[in-house]
């Protein structure tokens, strides 16, 4: 399993870090077998797996449940788990308790928190308590209502300057990596140059230290539209739809099951079942 030290070395040697989301056992198993460097159990599971309109309804229990499944599927991969909405805002005591639960109960290697400002103190407290933290700046889905929707962040000089300063604050507070979402490539590149910790982009251009995408977006599974920054590497949804249609047709036409899918009794046992009389 790669560690924080490995990711820092990858940054220094200019080797891109590959991160991918996973939410269950089979997806995690495939991700690990493929050789991803890091798995993110994102609160995006609320929209991708649970069918919510946003990440807001996702709970700590949800994150623990799904991370446990991912850990079973990927026992040798570094796993980062999202701290869900309001799980680290009400009080420092509650934030620490929730982080403790995720680390102890789920098998995660680190937690991820969104934003800077007051969140910097959370990063500092988690780090002091021995909880590795990945920071997340730019488009932060838990704050999408405040941000005015799913929009690119840091497009003007003032907001870009704040992004750069916030990134530095996150690093100073102890973050081991930084996710940059939906920010101009120039700003992401500048942040990457100024930080010693790895940056992982999602819609942040090609001059960051790594990339992360949502599993279902990459595979074209269960999603009708994907963001501009996504490259679809397959269309699993079409394959699944075709397979299910064939299954339904075979059952309706009594073409499934075939002989190769059935179990049979020996003739004498079948006869003995009814006392030597055939039915």
UniProtKB/Swiss-Prot annotation:
Catalysis performed (reactions): 3-methyl-2-oxobutanoate + (6R)-5,10-methylene-5,6,7,8-tetrahydrofolate + H2O = 2-dehydropantoate + (6S)-5,6,7,8-tetrahydrofolate
Molecular functions per Gene Ontology: 3-methyl-2-oxobutanoate hydroxymethyltransferase activity; magnesium ion binding
Homology family: Belongs to the PanB family.
Subcellular location: Cytoplasm
PANTHER family in alphabetical order: 3-METHYL-2-OXOBUTANOATE HYDROXYMETHYLTRANSFERASE
The keyword GTP-binding is annotated on this UniProt entry: no
Gene3D superfamilies for this protein: Phosphoenolpyruvate-binding domains
Residue ranges crossing the lipid bilayer per the database entry: none
Pathway: Cofactor biosynthesis; (R)-pantothenate biosynthesis; (R)-pantoate from 3-methyl-2-oxobutanoate: step 1/2
Name of the protein in its database record: 3-methyl-2-oxobutanoate hydroxymethyltransferase
InterPro entries (UniProt xref): Pantoate_hydroxy_MeTrfase (IPR003700), Pyrv/PenolPyrv_kinase-like_dom (IPR015813), Pyrv_kinase-like_dom_sf (IPR040442)
EC number from the UniProt entry: 2.1.2.11
Phylogenetic classification of the source organism: Bacteria, Bacillati, Bacillota, Bacilli, Bacillales
Quaternary structure and interacting proteins, as annotated: Homodecamer; pentamer of dimers.
């Amino acid at each position: 399993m790669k560690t924080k030290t490995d990711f820092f070395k990858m940054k220094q040697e200019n080797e891109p870090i590959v991160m991918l989301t996973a939410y269950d056992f089979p997806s995690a198993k495939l991700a690990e077998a493929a050789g991803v460097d890091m798995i993110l159990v994102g609160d995006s599971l609320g929209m991708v797996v649970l069918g919510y309109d946003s990440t807001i309804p996702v709970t700590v229990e949800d994150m623990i449940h799904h991370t446990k499944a991912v850990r079973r599927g990927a026992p040798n991969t570094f796993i980062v788990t999202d701290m869900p909405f309001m799980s680290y805002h009400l009080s420092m005591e509650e934030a620490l308790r929730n982080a403790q639960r995720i680390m102890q109960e789920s098998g995660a290697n680190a937690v991820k928190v969104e934003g800077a400002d007051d969140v910097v103190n959370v990063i500092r407290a988690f780090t002091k308590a021995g909880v590795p933290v990945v920071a997340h700046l730019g488009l932060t889905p838990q704050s999408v209502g405040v941000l005015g929707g799913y929009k690119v962040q840091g497009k003007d000089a003032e907001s870009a300057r704040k992004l750069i300063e916030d990134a530095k604050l996150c690093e100073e507070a102890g973050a081991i990596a930084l996710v940059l979402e939906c920010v101009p490539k120039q700003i992401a590149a500048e942040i990457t140059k100024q930080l010693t910790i790895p940056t992982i982009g999602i819609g942040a251009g090609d001059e960051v230290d790594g990339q992360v995408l949502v599993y279902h977006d990459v595979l074209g599974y269960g999603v009708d539209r994907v963001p501009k920054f996504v490259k679809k590497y397959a269309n699993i949804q079409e394959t699944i739809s075709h397979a299910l249609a064939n299954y339904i047709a075979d059952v309706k036409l009594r073409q499934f099951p075939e002989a190769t899918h059935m179990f049979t009794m020996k003739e004498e046992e079948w006869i003995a079942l009814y006392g030597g009389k055939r039915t």
